[in-house]
Regions:
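Hydrophobic/aromatic-rich alpha-helical bundle segments in the mid-to-C-terminal region
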Residues: 53-54, 201-217
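Short, flexible, glycine-rich and Lys/Arg-enriched loop motifs at helix boundaries
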Residues: 16-23, 148-157, 213
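Regulatory N- and C-terminal appendages and interdomain linkers associated
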Residues: 206, 216-236
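ATP-binding pocket architecture of kinase catalytic cores
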Residues: 1-87, 91-101, 120
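Active-site acidic catalytic loop and adjacent metal/ATP-binding pocket
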Residues: 3, 42, 87-139, 143
Length: 236
């Protein structure tokens, strides 16, 4: 016997490369608004005794230091010599922002993990990275250049303007995160994705899961490193 769960079947598409290339701008804006409001709803979930059993809330004062330390440990375990990633980890360690509050975050909220059915969000996938953290961690991940699927001028997930996304988010939360606050979180997002890409490549190399897609994922790392250097070099 083993644990299991039953899910409701949902309709829709999570194909990021198609969603960011929709020709109907009005449709894109409607979808983007729903994406922003769904994230806002998630960030307003409060903890309780049952949630604490499976997802305990960390200390606000140590959450970010612990997250960065975990990334250092993951990179060390990979046994790769990646000076740019090491430099980026040093940068984010010394540039940590003040954390005002911890909310329930998805951890991988991006185009590709959001099911779209016609003009609305029908489901959100891949919750294995969920944890308590700063809301900007989710917002930074969703808007990071590495998750825009080539539509770099559309900061909000490759499908729309940042202000439209945040206005939808603010309608539910009364919180609007200015874009200039995301520099730290964008660098963190790129470092994290680079580490995940190398971990996925290892799964193929170690014969854990033979997959051409996993094998090729590591080739994303140099571009991620270039993005990191570009972001660090941007003037405030």
């Amino acid at each position: 016997n083993s644990d299991f769960f039953i899910m409701e079947k949902i309709s829709g598409s999570a194909e990021g490369h198609k969603l960011v290339r929709l020709k109907d701008e009005t449709l894109q804006q409607k979808i983007l608004k729903d994406i922003g409001q769904r994230l806002a709803d998630l960030h307003q979930i409060e903890t309780d005794a049952e949630i604490e059993k499976i997802l305990p809330k960390p200390q606000k004062e140590t959450y970010l230091s612990d997250l960065i330390a975990d990334l250092y440990a993951q990179l060390d375990k990979l046994q790769r010599h990646r000076p740019v990633l090491e430099f980026a980890l040093s940068w984010i360690l010394h540039e940590k922002p003040v954390i005002d509050d911890l909310v329930l975050i998805h951890g991988d909220y991006r185009i590709g993990n959001i099911m779209i059915n016609q003009d609305h969000v029908s489901g959100i996938l891949d919750w294995e990275f969920s944890h308590w953290g700063d809301r900007r961690e989710d917002i930074g991940w969703f808007t990071a250049k590495c998750w825009r699927f080539g539509q770099d001028n559309q900061i909000a997930g490759g499908i729309g303007a940042y202000k439209n996304f945040m206005q939808a988010y603010a309608e539910r939360t009364e919180i609007y995160i200015p874009e200039f606050e995301l520099k730290f979180w964008h660098i963190l997002s790129h470092v994290r994705w680079a580490i995940i890409a190398m971990q996925q490549s290892n799964r193929n190399q170690n014969n854990t899961q033979a997959s051409l897609e996993l094998a090729l994922t590591e080739f994303l790392v140099p571009q991620l490193e270039k993005n990191i250097l570009d972001i660090i070099g941007e003037k405030e």
